[in-house]
Design a protein with these regions (language model features):
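NAD(P)H-binding glycine-rich loop region in Rossmannoid oxidoreductase-like domains
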Residues: 1-16
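Active-site beta-alpha turn of Rossmann-fold NAD(P)-dependent dehydrogenases/reductases
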Residues: 1, 39-43, 94-96, 156
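Substrate-positioning beta->alpha
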Residues: 73, 114-141
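Mid/C-terminal beta-alpha module of Rossmann-like enzyme folds, strongest
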Residues: 131, 135-209
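Conserved beta-loop-beta element that borders a ligand/cofactor-binding pocket
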Residues: 76-102, 147
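Conserved Rossmann-fold NAD(P)-dependent oxidoreductase catalytic core, especially the SDR/UDP-sugar
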Residues: 18-68
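Glycine/proline-rich active-site loop of Rossmann-fold NAD(P)-dependent oxidoreductases
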Residues: 76, 100-110, 118, 136-153
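Short-chain dehydrogenase/reductase
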Residues: 13-17, 55-79, 118-126
Length: 215
């Protein structure tokens, strides 16, 4: 995943695409492949740059990968691998940025590869884990019918987690007792495009099925 994927693009392609191919092959090789259900986690990066005024997105929007984003390329090809594999019941969930306690320790140049006026609907690490748990439990209970499977969904923690990158930088720096980004960084240190991030117009669809938002 990013940011390691930016440093090792060829290994990223081999890992993400190869893993998808291996999983599909293993499922289809079982004596009961039609009984096996598969969930693949995609990424918001597949739809690329979505700065204002096209900052609201949904599954079904054109795939538009940012230049040099090998991670998004690998995830898109892997996603297609599952969809076209012949597996009877698959679901694709596209993950957003994950909020987790140690996010401040992730020091990498990617912090400047984010448009300061861009947006993102984040998902907490707790909601992400709850999503996977509830997927298993709801399916086991027979609550997920054919209207759920063989579709794409966006993963987000909802309207409370829709925020501009500028606001996010202010919050992060504020936890360290520092001033806003305009006091610490030069504006031209940040890119103005060629990244990814959006608010989800269809984000509630997955919540209505799996009820994972609690943060």
């Amino acid at each position: 995943v990013s940011p390691t994927a930016d440093w090792k693009p060829y290994k990223t392609q081999k890992t993400n695409i190869g893993a998808a191919q291996s999983i599909c092959k293993a499922v289809l090789a079982q004596p009961n492949p039609d009984d096996i259900k598969v969930c693949y986690i995609g990424t918001v990066a597949e739809t690329g740059d979505r700065n204002y005024p096209i900052h609201w997105g949904r599954c079904g929007d054109p795939i538009k990968i940012s230049i040099y984003d090998h991670y998004a390329i690998s995830k898109t090809v892997a996603e297609r691998t599952f969809v076209e594999s012949g597996i009877k019941n698959w679901v694709v969930m596209r993950q957003s940025g994950i909020l987790y306690p140690n996010i401040l320790k992730n020091m990498d140049p990617i912090m400047f590869h984010v448009p300061i006026n861009g947006v993102l609907e984040w998902c907490t690490v707790e909601d992400s884990g709850r999503l996977m748990c509830n997927l298993v439990l709801e399916d086991e209970a027979g609550n997920l019918g054919s209207d759920f499977w063989n579709h794409f969904y966006n993963i987000g923690s909802g309207k409370e987690y829709r925020i501009s990158n500028y606001e996010f930088e202010c919050l992060l720096l504020g936890t360290l007792g520092l001033a806003g980004p305009e006091k610490l960084f030069e504006p031209n240190w940040f890119i103005t495009k060629n990244f990814h991030g959006q608010f989800y117009a269809d984000g509630d669809k997955l919540e209505n099925y799996l009820h994972f938002r609690e943060n």
